[in-house]
Curated annotation (Swiss-Prot):
Changing residue 249 to E: Lack of ATPase activity. Changing residue 307 to A: Slight decrease in ATPase activity. Oligomerization increases ATPase activity. Monomeric forms exhibit low-level ATPase activity by forming short-lived oligomers with active site contributions from at least two protomers. In contrast, oligomers exhibit enhanced ATP hydrolysis rates that likely result from multiple preformed active sites within the oligomeric complex. Oligomerization is important for both enzyme activation and T3SS function. The N-terminal domain is required for oligomerization and ATPase activity. The six N-terminal residues are necessary for proper oligomer formation, though their absence does not entirely preclude oligomerization. The extreme N-terminus is also required for interaction with MxiN/SctL. The N-terminal domain, not ATPase activity, is responsible for localization of Spa47/SctN to the injectisome. The binding of ATP induces a conformational change of a highly conserved luminal loop, facilitating ATP hydrolysis. Belongs to the ATPase alpha/beta chains family. T3SS ATPase subfamily. Changing residue 267 to A/R: Does not affect oligomerization. Exhibits ATPase activity levels similar to the monomeric form. Shows at or near wild-type levels of hemolysis and invasion. Increased IpaC secretion. Changing residue 272 to A: Abolishes oligomerization. Exhibits ATPase activity levels similar to the wild-type monomeric form. Shows severely attenuated levels of both invasion and hemolysis. Low levels of secreted IpaC. It catalyses: ATP + H2O + cellular proteinSide 1 = ADP + phosphate + cellular proteinSide 2. Disruption phenotype: Mutant is defective for assembly of the needle and secretion of the translocon proteins IpaB/SctE and IpaC/SctB. Amount of the needle filament protein MxiH/SctF is greatly reduced. T3SS effector protein secretion is reduced in Shigella strains coexpressing wild-type and inactive Spa47/SctN. This is Type 3 secretion system ATPase. The core secretion machinery of the T3SS is composed of approximately 20 different proteins, including cytoplasmic components, a base, an export apparatus and a needle. This subunit is part of the cytosolic complex. Forms homohexamers. Interacts directly with MxiN/SctL (stator protein) and Spa13/SctO (stalk protein). Can form a soluble complex with Spa33/SctQ, MxiN/SctL and MxiK/SctK.
Amino acid sequence: MSYTKLLTQLSFPNRISGPILETSLSDVSIGEICNIQAGIESNEIVARAQVVGFHDEKTILSLIGNSRGLSRQTLIKPTAQFLHTQVGRGLLGAVVNPLGEVTDKFAVTDNSEILYRPVDNAPPLYSERAAIEKPFLTGIKVIDSLLTCGEGQRMGIFASAGCGKTFLMNMLIEHSGADIYVIGLIGERGREVTETVDYLKNSEKKSRCVLVYATSDYSSVDRCNAAYIATAIAEFFRTEGHKVALFIDSLTRYARALRDVALAAGESPARRGYPVSVFDSLPRLLERPGKLKAGGSITAFYTVLLEDDDFADPLAEEVRSILDGHIYLSRNLAQKGQFPAIDSLKSISRVFTQVVDEKHRIMAAAFRELLSEIEELRTIIDFGEYKPGENASQDKIYNKISVVESFLKQDYRLGFTYEQTMELIGETIR
């Protein structure tokens, strides 16, 4: 090997700032993994980094992990490899870190051969996708009746802090009818990862679940990669013909990690501090789920943290425009103790009409109309204008309030079949 070629393959860092390294490496690609050695005389690998951009003839890398122990004598060596993750049935019941490695097991499952797959895959072509025509039943009354999901749909769960996103996600895992569940906890607190693992240990579905995590203390690139890894694992089980449910909590923290990486790579902020590349990257992740003609499906649920109780956040607006529907959680309903705190009038499933029959559509429309009338009556009551006995139609609506609220509430331990849900909504609107 020539001396010049050797220099292009090894480099010292020009700058180390937090998780970001700048170097003079030239023969590398975006997404490539580089090993970091302690020094030129040592082969010990002390860290790894991922190429995230190029700027002013410099290559910018983001550390996988932290920068503790690195120095000017640190040597950066390209590997010509990209991040891969473990996949396979042996992953069921496992906890997976942002490197795609199993770190723990919460269920004893089949120890079959572990395979490796790239994490940043292209979405399926339109010609490979199957139409969404079959309902994905969640066991949650308000969703299955008013916001019916379809196999292969992508739904957003939008809420401000403290509205019960994790509560709803646990209900979806416990009561929905998927074959495999892949849960990605992105940028969450370490306590929440511990609580989720403990929850899964006691779940009847633990042997069909995979948990991928990157807590808030992990580097930005780790948090991004954890979302890719969770999706790649779901894709593997889809190719095996399974009906997969994918949960990413939260998509907002994934987007913030993208923002941090992009800003560190020298991009300029645009919409609300987010560089343009963040909005380019979102569809590449969100378009990967779906139902395939070859068999198998990924039905995905993404939690989105709102800054307040509306959709003014540009990130939330962008995500809502990409997904196939959204479930809006209301702080007011949560404060009243109504769980799941779903605001049915602000929520929508864009495949609803494709997966339910005419009778179901009529009943759902009647319930929404009743719910809207109740909201109007609440305003009249708040102004002190309602007097029982003066208006028969208002009295009829008033007498329905407790029945409607009872339907919208649900104990997290209870799941309802489709038949039970439709019977209950029929009784409510009768």
